[in-house]
Amino acid sequence: MGNGKIFIQIASYRDPQLIHTIRDCDMKASDPSKLVYSIAWQHSNDDEWDQIHEFKNDPRFKVVDIDYKDSKGACWARNQLQQNYDGEQYTLQIDSHHRFVQDWDLELIEMYNQLKEKGHEKPLLTGYVSSFDPDNDPAGRIQTPWKMNFDRFIPEGAVFFLPASIDNYKQLTEPIPARFYSAHFAFTTGDFVKEVPHDPEYYFHGEEIS
């Protein structure tokens, strides 16, 4: 049996939404005690909007403290925080600007197990999460879920994606197969952190196809 814990990966770069994201994630979880946060905190001491001192004494939080001038990019930051993985059963990788539904953890675990029961050994739930308005939440949330579509190749060879609506989502009873991986929202087995770590040599574009 697994430990039921979720290793939450957040790479943040001077993001005014970081604190709100953490609070909402914790508040909306059915069991916050099962959450383990690993945060790459790329910040300036002069910034006031992303100070995470309120979580300093919470043993669930593992913070990689990085001066923003020393950052080597999103992929490097994600790789840094992945070093804190300690055998949690699941992992959730998100950006530092998100909002959640009530009992989001139960929803994700249920979908994950649903796919396992259908024969998928290590299912991964991913996609572009619909937008929200931080000044008008939850009323300002886009309610239609998105999928990832190919957009174009840039001259350097990296592939760009764009979100597109899942038109028949109200008729769906289970997740649909995805063609691409989104680094800004991914939920799967915790083993993913060790088996498919982020390549620290990528800066930003290219991380999702690497």
Regions found by a protein language model. Name each.
Residues 1-210:
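Catalytic cores of eukaryotic secretory-pathway lumenal/extracellular enzymes that build
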